[in-house]
């Protein structure tokens, strides 16, 4: 592990960044742009902070942090992002809130864990663009569903035809969204095919019955092409498939349950994949039929989701496509 002399906490917003060195109680407020980053370098120089021996801790913000991360990579500064909820839950009782105070607490969080910190991998521009495209595709799909509901409700309530102005406009919006969605999906495939390893892994996981293009794209994006999770179980926890104990002392003896702290979008897509796998995979169908005799369907569905995750990670590790060789016993 690289020895870091300074751990800085950075609270990033759309227009500004707040930087704090909790150990020395030093702080800086700057713009989230090139001028602000230059101000940060000068501040470090004024306080004898060696950036080559500095570790920066910041939160995931959904995109506002990318410019600062690009600056860190250009200056060869080690950094790591953490979920905001993880840092928030580590603080204990907190009163009041400000960007400066948040930066101080982020720095404290990093200093307490400095011996266990590992730098993040450099940003992968293809993965970053893939996530952006998937997010925009999701927005288009939701808009389309909204316009479809408008058409359906209007026809039901007012008994109007396709010549109605609102229905015609909504129909035009739906057609435009379909065209844009097709363009987005074409760009996604173009992006995946441009990376040989990414495209091979995509072909591997979509060879599994139940894993279609959307699940394939999202799995590639959120596992960063199977590099950001050490194994299938860690990814299953992230998605919210692994059940955890719910018991304490003698009074609380609940059943194991999955956590609400999960990537809900991935879980939802895997839910659909599990249903399709049960329908079209003889092995999964036989498993579901056997377990339905004494298990709840939701539990079986969750188990199938975990099996699909295990298959994806196992096949990618071996570099092999899925081959259906299940034979049902007579």
Please place each PLM-identified region on the residue numbering.
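Short helix-capping/linker segments at secondary-structure and domain boundaries
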Residues: 113-118, 224-228, 276-283, 311-324
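Gly/Thr-rich phosphate-binding beta-strand-loop-beta motif of the actin/hexokinase/Hsp70
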Residues: 2-22, 106
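Stable alpha-helical structural segments in soluble proteins, enriched in small hydrophobic residues
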Residues: 99-110, 269, 273, 308, ...
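Nucleic-acid-processing active sites and adjacent nucleic-acid-binding tracks
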Residues: 24-50, 55
